[in-house]
Amino acid sequence: MKKVLGLVVAAAMGLSSAAFAAETATTPAPTATTTKAAPAKTTHHKKQHKAAPAQKAQAAKKHHKNTKAEQKAPEQKAQAAKKHAGKHSHQQPAKPAAQPAA
């Protein structure tokens, strides 16, 4: 009678009646000799500590520029000379236009 009541309650609660019946009917068997596995040997990895860098100003930390002291500044040119740098060598001197006889 208790099993039937248990099944009804289990069905009302939304549990599987077969699982509930199997759970209540059988008692858990005592486990036989359980042996614990030996814990795995753990290896500890040591971190390599880097040497502390020299202290810098905030602006120096943010702006990493490759500056060379020996590098000289390029010659200043007019804008037209910069744009047409390669075209000057191929031009030939202009010939005077032939004037028709009057």
Swiss-Prot record:
Residues 1-21 form the signal peptide. Disulfide bonds: none annotated. GO terms for cellular component: periplasmic space. Residues 22-41, 91-102 have a biased composition (Low complexity). InterPro entries: Acid_shock. It is found in: Periplasm. Proteolytic processing gives rise to the active protein. Residues 80-90 have a biased composition (Basic residues). Pfam families: Asr. Residues 22-58 form a propeptide. Keywords: Periplasm, Signal. It comes from the Bacteria. Its main location: periplasm. Residues 22-102 are annotated as: Disordered. Belongs to the Asr family. Required for growth and/or survival at acidic conditions. This is Acid shock protein. The lineage of its organism: Bacteria, Pseudomonadati, Pseudomonadota, Gammaproteobacteria, Enterobacterales.
